[in-house]
Amino acid sequence: MDDTELARLQQVVQADPADIEARLALLHGLVRAKRWHEAEQLGIPLLEVEDAPATVHACMGIVYGKQGRWDEAVQQCRQAITLYPDDALALFNLGTLLAHQDDTKAALECLEKAVAHEPEWAETHYTLGTVLLRQERYQEAIRAFDRAIESHATYPEAYFNRGNAHALRGLEADGSLDYYELDCAINAYKTAIQQRPGYAAALYNLGMVYQRMRSSEGVRVWDQYVEATQDLPDEEIWRLRAQEYKHDLQDRLR
């Protein structure tokens, strides 16, 4: 919905504040436009309407979440799901919010339901994968990232986290390396970088894999990372570490 359509809906709502359908359409438009304050101002009165539709609660869950008002966001998403249990978007948003609050079990339950309702929705698979990754359920996380990639081939974040899952599987408890898993991690990181040139986190983690493998490729990757982040102040500490790792690797390769 473009600005012209939003302006038209605002005029309709101003002319007839009792037109609930127009107010709902405007609320959707403001949420899509990421105009959170305006959406909040419109949505609060709609919540007070008797038998407010599930879509109002779902939209306000998104708005409150974007504003960092986590408890209110969770409450709104739960109300939306109470009214419409099969709302995949509300389930996805609730799962994301619960993951943010470290309620992993409930988050996984919501995300798995969302996936069941919308199996082609890449972002849901990806978010499910990130929660599983934090739970160290690496193989399940990899499957979730694979499904995200199947639904949306250009998804550098999914390849990046797929690489992370393989990299963590590649480090055995006794300190030994599983080179098959590390090779899978390398390929995933490379694809992420190919899809997003200069992807700092993927370059850094790729460098770390080569560092552990004592591969000369690590020297080249560390140089790439330093070059890609030279104008990024937030990467300064990591850039210094990368330079240290590079020198250490060069010493080991001599």
Protein language model regions, located:
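A generic tandem-repeat structural signature
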Residues: E50-E123
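Structural marker of alpha-solenoid helical repeat scaffolds
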Residues: A15, V49, L83, H117, ...
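Structural signature of tandem alpha-helical TPR/SEL1-like repeats
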Residues: M1-Q10, A33-P45, Q67-Q79, Q101-K113, ...
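Terminal, low-structured helical/coil segments at or just beyond the last alpha-helical repeat
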Residues: M1-A7, R212, V219-R254
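Helix-start (N-cap) detector for alpha-helical repeat units in TPR-like alpha-solenoids
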Residues: I20-E21, P53-T55, A88-L89, A122-E123, ...
